[in-house]
Structure formats: structure tokens, C-alpha cells
Amino acid sequence: MGKTLVFGHKNPDTDTICSAIAYADLKNKIGVEAEAVRLGEINGETQFALDFFKQEAPRFIETAANETKQVILVDHNEFQQSVSDIDQVQVTEVIDHHRIANFETSEPLYYRAEPVGCTATILNKMYKENQVKIEKEIAGLLLSAIISDSLLFKSPTCTQQDIDAAHELAEIAGVDPEVYGLDMLKAGADLSQKTVQELITIDAKEFALGNSKVEIAQVNTVDIAEVTARQTDIEAKINEVIAAKGLDLFVLVITDILENDSLALALGAEAAKVEKAFHVTLENNTALLKGVVSRKKQVVPALTDALS
């Protein structure tokens, strides 16, 4: 049957990378030849986790069909977020915690999606269901994914299942989740060396919302002003992306991980829909979104309603 490739979405975050590594590990331990790969560059937060638990980053691929017939998707399902030749391979499994959209297969598959804060929380269960011991390093990566997606348990996407799983995994990994978690988040929030291009692509996802083509990028920081100081250059680069991709709306969500608020920078023909979605007024193309930290649970649903 050959090797199955396991990967998450483009512009990978910590859950995408760590869940791919963990699920490939589980598949191999139950007798399925699998390899974790990635569709983009590793961000600073994820690199911190990989270094801390002494794990190698998965290798980068641009296409999958040239080396396998079967793939497993983790942490995503929407085809525009996946590998470019997704239509040329068979998706045999999906393990995810997002909405289902723009997803169709020609053959039956194993599809597992749960309303939890992180794919890693589901994988923690799957190790138990398969009676496979989670090694210390894998536990550390799964913990890192949960901390990342839940913003150290502060995000509205975080469930009790995520918190319980994180504490189980922290015990196996031998770390204090609060201390380790804050160090990891701070590593990801250091934007001082990031180019403008990196700021708007490091965690960007494309969505079809209503009849609109929308891209939502998110960066975490401990100082929003550090990002807005570069607003002119950021807007120029965003406008290039809008033109190149034919986007109706690009929203950069700049999240303060200490205050748990975000600043939205919105550009494009549908930028006014951000005002409708969040009951705010854009000034200089920006608006403060109080208490908004989750793209999945707070930004995408609000924009979906506004654009429908």
C-alpha cells in the first residue's frame, strides 16, 4: 500500500505540526507506515516546542501525489488550506476540530472531528483507545499544541477536555504546563525579527465565507504597538496579496496574549463587513476587538454571518 503522508494545513501552527508528528507516531506503532510532513515554514513558537522536546521538524513538501497515493489530514479539512494537489490523492483519514467546508471525497474515509480546542486533545484519546503508550517527547508536543491553540487555557475554544488532557500530558512530559506554556507563547510572540511578509503569512488561512474569498491571518504579541508601528508596510503587502489572490477581504488579527484582546486590521472590498461582524468602527483600517482571541470560534463565525 505504501507510505501514508500525514500533514496539517498550510502556514502551519503548533497544533498542525505537533499533531502530524504524533499521529504518524501512533500510526507507525499500530502497524501503518506513515510519515509526518509539513506544508510551510515552522514558526518560532513551534520551534521552541520542537527544541525543548528534542524533536526534528517534519520535512517540507509542496506536492503529495508524486510520492504517495494516500494522505491523512490533521487540524484541517478545507481543501484550499491543504496541499496543492489534494485532488490527486486519496484522503483516508481526517482528524480535526474545525468546521467542515469545501471538503469532498470520492471514497469513504475515517473522519473524526470533535468540538474541542485542539486536534492534540483528540489524539490523546486515540493513543488510549489503541492502548499505545505516549512517550515523553510526544506528550510534550501534544501538550504544546493544546497550550498554543487554547492560549494557555484562556481561549473560548478551550474545553475541560483540553485542560484535562494538557495536565495528563504535562505529567508524562515532566513539565509545569503554566511555566512551560508561558515560555512557549512568549517565544511565539517575539515578532522583532519577522519581516512584513512573515507577519501576514505565518498563521494565515483562506476561507470561502458566503460568496466572498477571505483570508484571515493571526499573530500573537505582547505589544500590539510593535506591530502597528509597521502598519503602512503591512497594508502595502496585504494589498499585494489581495490583488494576487483575488480576495474580497483580508483581516490581520493581532492578538495580545497578556490582555486577551485583539486588534483587527481589515482591507479589501468587504472590509466594512468587519464593522458589521463585531459592532465596531474601523479607524485607519483598524478596530479593537475586546475579548477576541480565537479565529475559529470568534472571528470566522462572526464574519460568516456578516458576509452571508
Swiss-Prot record:
Record key words, sorted: Cytoplasm, Hydrolase, Manganese, Metal-binding
PANTHER family: BNIP - RELATED, MANGANESE-DEPENDENT INORGANIC PYROPHOSPHATASE-RELATED
Name of the protein: Probable manganese-dependent inorganic pyrophosphatase
Binding site for Mn(2+) 2: 15, 75, 97, 149
Enzyme class: hydrolase
Residues annotated as binding Mn(2+) 1: 9, 13, 75
Location(s), subcellular: Cytoplasm
An example molecular function term from Gene Ontology annotations: inorganic diphosphate phosphatase activity
SUPFAM superfamilies xref list: DHH phosphoesterases
Recorded GO CC terms: cytoplasm
Catalytic reaction equation(s): diphosphate + H2O = 2 phosphate + H(+)
Family: Belongs to the PPase class C family.
EC number: 3.6.1.1
InterPro entries: DDH_dom, DHH_sf, DHHA2, DHHA2_dom_sf, Mn-dep_inorganic_PyrPase
Record's cofactor remark: Binds 2 manganese ions per subunit.
Main location, first listed in the record: cytoplasm
Cofactor: Mn(2+)
One Pfam entry name: DHH
